[in-house]
Amino acid sequence: MAGHDVQYGKHRTRRSFSRIKEVLGLPNLIEIQTDSFKEFLDTGLKEVFEDVLPISNFTDTMELEFVGYELKEPKYTLEEARIHDASYSAPIFVTFRLINKETGEIKTQEVFFGDFPIMTEMGTFIINGGERIIVSQLVRSPGVYFNDKVDKNGKVGYGSTVIPNRGAWLELETDSKDIAYTRIDRTRKIPFTTLVRALGFSGDDEIVDIFGDSELVRNTIEKDIHKNPADSRTDEALKEIYERLRPGEPKTADSSRSLLVARFFDPRRYDLAAVGRYKLNKKLNIKTRLLGQTIAENLVDPETGEILVEAGTEMTRDVIDSIAEHLDGDLNKFVYTPNDYAVVTEPVVLQKFKVVAPNDPDRVVTIVGNANPDDKVRALTTADILAEMSYFLNLAEGIGKVDDIDHLGNRRIRAVGELLANQFRIGLARMERNVRERMSVQDNEALTPQQIINIRPVTAAVKEFFGSSQLSQFMDQHNPLSELSHKRRLSALGPGGLTRDRAGYEVRDVHYTHYGRMCPIETPEGPNIGLINNLSTYGRLNKYGFIQTPYRKVDRATGKVTNEVVWLTADEEDEYIVAQANSKLNEDGTFAEEIVMGRHQGVNQEYPSHLVDFVDVSPKQVVAVATACIPFLENDDSNRALMGANMQRQAVPLIDPKAPFVGTGMEYQAAHDSGAAVIAKHDGKVVYSDADKVEVRREDGSLDVYTIQKFRRSNSGTAYNQRTLVKVGDIVEKGDFIADGPSMEGGEMALGQNPIVAYMTWEGYNFEDAVIMSERLVKDDVYTSVHLEEFESETRDTKLGPEEITRELPNVSEEALKNLDEMGIIRIGAEVKEGDILVGKVTPKGEKDLSAEERLLHAIFGDKSREVRDTSLRVPHGGDGVVRDVKIFTRANGDELQSGVNMLVRVYIAQKRKIKVGDKMAGRHGNKGVVSRIVPVEDMPYLPDGTPVDIMLNPLGVPSRMNIGQVMELHLGMAARNLGIYIATPVFDGASSEDLWDTVREAGMDSDAKTILYDGRTGEPFDNRVSVGVMYMIKLHHMVDDKLHARSVGPYSLVTQQPLGGKAQFGGQRFGEMEVWALEAYGASNILQEILTYKSDDVNGRLKAYEAITKGKPIPKPGVPESFRVLVKELQSLGLDMRVLDEDDYEVELRDLDEGEDDDVMHVDDLEKARVQQAKEAAELEKAKEEALDKTE
């Protein structure tokens, strides 16, 4: 037997064909959300408060300090928040200290700071009753970036940018004359030496001393001449910079100094963030810059005077490692003191080294480092600016390298915690201005923190973020996999990110650093391709927001691949050679082959095994969760795999789902971590179990109660239904399944079913990817799903009186009210059809003012005679089903309702949808198709043992699409069915073709895995043997019931008077310009005239035509279409005198616009009137007939 058995949870064993021993299990798949939010509550929120506070008033006599904060218990439980359309949030209380510096008085007070939304255990937020997700954002990391560009003459120029988290950009660039310029915050450029002089190093010799002598420095100094001898060089430079930043304002050196300090050196205005400081120090670090250079001076220990490295030595990694302590210490550190006019006058510490120029051995180049400022220094320092300039000048000498902005070492993830912190900071900054003004205006003695703090800007910022940010999204809840994928999504769009239109190919493309961090396959098709990605299975974030992936460390001394796991970011990985997970190993853990396949900085090639530093942890670390659920992924073309991964997320939960016979072993973990199942929180023993709740007695005696959700409506309108898996007496451990969620079976994800599939054509019905299906799948409810739709009706106070929910509806038959209760609300369990009343409601009609007598009669006899309009909630087009639940909310019951609303009724209708012609089906390999025919079971082809086939697919759908995985799955699935086993074939480490054929033989199938099929209609065998097997097929969310639409009478657009478009508006089918050409080509003039007049926008014509049809008279000639009148009005609005004349030169009167209703859509009232009139006439006719009959009798 090929393969070995693996246990997944307590309910499923699979035969796995994996060969690679995985030393690291999958991490929790939603930790990117939960960990980030936890960190925000633990430290992030505190940091935001400490950033903005303390706040002083303008005279610095009062100060408001932050002490701490506390989150109290949430107001609603999760379930209550869902039912009441509320947010699941906890009140946050912040303690402030107000210090009066004149009197020394201190007031401490706790202030309510609004309700803060809390993340659920599933990694989601409940906002206004809807489950939402904050998508993590992929943005360019703060730091310093160097780039090169070739001009039209083929000359290479260099550029550099310091990008902060917030604050002004500082750019350097060269021009065609080899002069270096700087720009501050995208303004006009100035020679870079001007900025150096402003920083307090004004002499030309000083500048050459810092940066070394080079052509670029010399050319720039020549360009930067001393224009005004009355000013010092530093003052002149400061004025020049001020002129660029504030053109047209009077320039003084002092105002320029304070402006530059505010722009770059004030931590409140300029923030690199921890990650920016880390990236800056890393890039400007002397160690990386010296690597591979030849040192041009002796390096001497400043304390002992010992020569550490002699001049002429090449600085290899070993040499640098040997003097690493000294490089981090005081080796070659120089202190420069800026002059007294400088922007910042503190002494500047720089590290300077002289190396031989790579392109000219006779020249010496100076490398300047920033002496690694502390991580807590979040603003720029003078040393940072000088070191950046040095790196930039070194690039022209061939030292250092330019950056790739698409490298994942330069792109980082802003997860939910950071996005919330940024939003909170914006709110606090708005509040700060407010607080400062109140502190200055009001009487100091009586002030308390509560009085000067207005929390509205903060709560508004948070509310706005959750309600309307591009990154706050309604959770995709089609099935557990789509939930999980949504939580792991990474978007490059959103505030501070890219826009679809500006994103080019490079940003969207797969980069070698995506390996193990972002999935190269799962991304949407369409305009967002490559901008929205998914985290790989093992990816996680480090403290700076860079994605890390795990590798097994290779012990270079012994050559053994150890079980020690090291997590590396993309730029750390660039220094190593990494071998693939499937490299063959000996028993002792050493490489079995001298040469192994490996990667180094994007180069995939063979490397000697003794050079390898790390080995992949698992073959599936490359791909995302959805992609890892595709068996035989390695045999599919990547474009089809992309569709396969995306379509699994659109699977509809079925009534009785089945886990796949051929899985990848990922199904268990995906179901477990998705948040849709009920998972045991502690060890214990089941003491009670039914369909609605499970009770587990813990070892310490306490009781855990788990509620099971039954048929709740999910965000996407499908039934969210959980099924209990445990019985009384079962022992459960922490992490075990207590109940399956939707699309789960036995603790595994089960998106579809395992039908018997044949690759064969049948009467041409599976042309163009269509799917032929057996009626068995309809009768046995194999692909039946339940869909829940929510309808609501509310009663409001109108100017004419309150609306009412009632059974007493005007002009409605008793038959139509038969399912309503005494209040006028539909009963639960009623079967309703399109147009049935769900909630009877009447609205007062203001026709005339009542006289005193009528008012008296109303007071005595009740409101029966009052004029009311029937505004009942009815079942919309295509919404028929069974009433599943009714919820009533009133103020009397203590429910919170919007102002003006007195009562709210919600009705849930369940629809059972069987599969039908027009529904979309798909496999897991991007093989999608639409059901074209449902064939009676007796007519389907059958196997030699009499089993009829369930589905027939077109064999022509396979070769050109190159998704051969489906054929391998088909054969292995048949073998699994015959053997009665489940199979796991993990991606890139699954069943080989030998394993496949061994299993086929073991199952007793023919050696080619094909079979003879018999025609169900004739009983004759087909000419050729056919591939028949079991393939996992899913039903997708694109169902024909949601798309089917027909209109007879409906709403018209107000201006053009043409029917509206689209199913939602109950619109018509557009007969466009090209369709008109087609009818013109046929010469079908009468049909054309009808289409362009009665059926479209000839208002009077359509009314008369309706009347004529109902009375059986000939249809009159059409009039002028409304669109023609619109055209006339448009021409008149241009000042042209347009009139329409008939053939006798009489002017034709056109209808005026204000005859329609005062509404965007002109409804069908005219037709209604015509119908009522006709009904009256018919009734009178009947009456007359009856009377005539009476007389004759």
Curated annotation (Swiss-Prot):
One MF term in the entry's GO annotations: DNA binding
Region (Disordered): 1173-1193
The entry's keywords: DNA-directed RNA polymerase, Nucleotidyltransferase, Transcription, Transferase
Catalyzed reaction equations: RNA(n) + a ribonucleoside 5'-triphosphate = RNA(n+1) + diphosphate
GO biological process, one term: DNA-templated transcription
EC number per UniProt: 2.7.7.6
Pfam family, one: RNA_pol_Rpb2_3
Regions of compositional bias (Basic and acidic residues) in chain numbering: 1177-1193
GO cellular component terms, A-Z: DNA-directed RNA polymerase complex
EC top class named in words: transferase
InterPro entries, sorted: DNA-dir_RNA_pol_bsu_ext_1_sf, DNA-dir_RNA_pol_bsu_external_1, DNA-dir_RNA_pol_su2, DNA-dir_RNAP_su2_dom, DNA-dir_RNAP_su2_hyb_sf, RNA_pol_bsu_bac, RNA_pol_bsu_CS, RNA_pol_bsu_protrusion
Recorded family membership: Belongs to the RNA polymerase beta chain family.
Record note on quaternary structure: The RNAP catalytic core consists of 2 alpha, 1 beta, 1 beta' and 1 omega subunit. When a sigma factor is associated with the core the holoenzyme is formed, which can initiate transcription.
Function per UniProt: DNA-dependent RNA polymerase catalyzes the transcription of DNA into RNA using the four ribonucleoside triphosphates as substrates.
Protein name (record): DNA-directed RNA polymerase subunit beta
Organism: Streptococcus thermophilus (strain ATCC BAA-491 / LMD-9)
Annotated gene: rpoB
